């Protein structure tokens, strides 16, 4: 196998890792504690502020912050696809990869 064919094969396998990770869209990295401790000002020394997409929420009580943060920044059960399909499933793209390797690269 020539060096060029090996390099093309490595690029294909590395790019397939990214495609494989796209199929796992339901796994979203959320911090274990979405509320971080900070100093709010002179009146309230200890605050817990929410890390979220929708708005910043701060509370002197950590439990209130956790409850409100999870309520507002809830992750939907079914991720929105905006009308776009997930694409080809893993068995199909592996089939096409095999065909590509066989016919184009001649391996």
Curated annotation (Swiss-Prot):
Record-annotated membrane-spanning stretches: 87-107
Organism domain of life: Eukaryota
Disulfide bonds: 35-49, 40-69, 47-65, 50-58
Cellular component GO terms held in the UniProt record: membrane
Tissue expression profile of the protein: Expressed in flowers.
Cleaved signal peptide residues: 1-22
Topology in membrane: Single-pass membrane protein
Alphabetically ordered keywords of this record: Disulfide bond, Membrane, Signal, Transmembrane, Transmembrane helix
Record localization: Membrane
Membership in a protein family: Belongs to the MEG family.
Name of the protein this chain belongs to: EMBRYO SURROUNDING FACTOR 1-like protein 5
Organism annotation: Arabidopsis thaliana
Upper taxonomic lineage: Eukaryota, Viridiplantae, Streptophyta, Embryophyta, Tracheophyta
Gene name, Swiss-Prot/TrEMBL: ESFL5
